[in-house]
C-alpha cells in the first residue's frame, strides 16, 4: 500500500477493505498463500487487521472453505516474519469467537512463539474470544495456569481478565488457583486482574464473596488494597466510590485484612 490506511478517505478505506477481502477469498479458493502472506505481513497495522478480520468473516460465510483456511493458517504460522505469525494468531482469534476447537492449536503454539508480538496476539485473542465464547476458552486457559514458565502463567492470567470484567464469577475460580504464586510478576498481574474485575456494578460483591474462600490472606490483603485503589483511579466509571468500596470490604470480609 502506497498510502497509510488512515491517510485515505473513509470511502477509500472501505474500498481497500473490500479489495483485501476479495483478494484473500480468491487466494483461499486457489490455495495461493503468497497474496495472503503479503497482507498478513504488511507494515501497516490496519491492513493486517483488515486481513485477519476478513479471514474471520470468510470462515463463517464460506463454510466450504473452513478446512482450507485452517490449513493456510497452519502453513503461514511457520513463516519467519513475526508479523505474519501475529496475524495468523489474530485470525484464529476471530474464528475462535465461535469455533474455538478448530483453532485451539494456534494458541498452544503461539504461547511459545519466539516473538513477543505473537505471544501478545494470543493474550488479545484470549480476551476477545473469552468475552463471547468463554466455556471452551477458559477450559483451555486452565491447562496453563500451573505451567512451569512464569510468563505463560502471567499471560494466561492477563488474558482471561476481559471476561471477568462483566462476569467475575467465571474467572475467579481460575484466579484462585494462582493464590500461592511465588513469582512477583505473576502475583502482581493476579492482583491487578482482581482489581480490574471489581469496579463495575455488582462485581465487588461477587469478588469479595469469592475472596472469602481463599486461604492466602496476604494475597487477599493485596487484592483489597488494589480494589480500593482501582475505585479511586476509575472513579469516573466505577459503580462505587473509593470510600464505599472500602466500607463494603470492611463490613463484609470477616477479618481485618490490613493485619498482614
How would you describe each model-predicted region?
Residues 54, 68, 72-75, 79, ...:
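Generic beta-strand or strand-like secondary-structure segments
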Residues 35-55:
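Short, contiguous, helix-prone interaction/anchoring segments in small proteins
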Residues 215-260:
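Eukaryotic acidic, Ser/Thr-rich intrinsically disordered low-complexity regions
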Residues 2, 26-39, 60-76, 97-110, ...:
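Amphipathic alpha-helical scaffolding segments comprising HEAT/armadillo-like alpha-solenoid repeats
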Residues 4-27, 49-63, 85-98, 117-132, ...:
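Structural detector for internal amphipathic alpha-helices that build alpha-solenoid repeat scaffolds
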Residues 138-161:
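Hydrophobic, aromatic-enriched interface-forming segments
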Residues 9, 43-46, 80-82, 114-115, ...:
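Short inter-helical turns and helix N-cap capping residues of alpha-solenoid HEAT/ARM repeat scaffolds
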Amino acid at each position: 500500500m502506497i498510502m497509510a490506511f488512515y491517510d485515505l478517505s473513509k470511502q477509500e478505506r472501505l474500498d481497500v477493505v473490500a479489495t483485501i477481502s476479495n483478494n484473500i477469498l480468491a487466494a483461499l479458493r486457489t490455495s495461493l498463500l503468497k497474496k495472503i502472506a503479503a497482507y498478513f505481513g504488511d507494515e501497516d497495522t490496519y491492513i493486517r487487521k483488515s486481513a485477519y478480520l476478513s479471514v474471520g468473516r470468510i470462515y463463517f460465510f464460506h463454510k466450504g472453505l473452513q478446512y482450507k483456511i485452517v490449513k493456510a493458517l497452519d502453513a503461514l504460522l511457520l513463516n519467519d516474519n513475526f508479523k505474519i505469525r501475529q496475524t495468523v494468531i489474530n485470525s484464529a482469534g476471530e474464528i475462535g469467537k465461535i469455533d474455538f476447537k478448530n483453532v485451539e492449536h494456534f494458541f498452544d503454539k503461539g504461547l511459545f512463539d519466539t516473538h513477543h508480538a505473537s505471544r501478545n496476539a494470543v493474550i488479545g485473542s484470549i480476551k476477545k474470544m473469552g468475552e463471547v465464547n468463554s466455556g471452551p476458552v477458559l477450559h483451555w486457559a486452565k491447562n496453563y495456569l500451573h505451567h512451569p514458565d512464569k510468563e505463560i502463567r502471567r499471560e494466561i492470567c492477563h488474558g482471561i481478565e476481559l471476561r471477568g470484567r462483566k462476569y467475575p464469577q467465571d474467572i475467579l475460580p481460575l484466579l484462585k488457583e494462582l493464590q500461592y504464586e511465588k513469582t512477583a510478576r505473576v502475583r502482581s498481574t493476579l492482583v491487578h486482574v482482581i482489581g480490574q474485575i471489581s469496579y463495575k456494578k455488582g462485581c465487588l460483591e461477587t469478588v469479595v464473596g469469592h475472596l472469602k474462600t481463599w486461604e492466602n490472606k496476604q494475597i487477599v490483603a493485596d487484592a483489597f488494597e488494589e480494589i480500593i485503589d482501582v475505585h479511586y483511579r476509575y472513579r469516573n466509571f466505577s459503580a462505587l466510590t473509593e470510600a464505599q468500596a472500602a466500607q463494603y470490604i470492611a463490613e463484609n470480609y470477616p477479618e481485618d485484612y490490613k493485619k498482614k
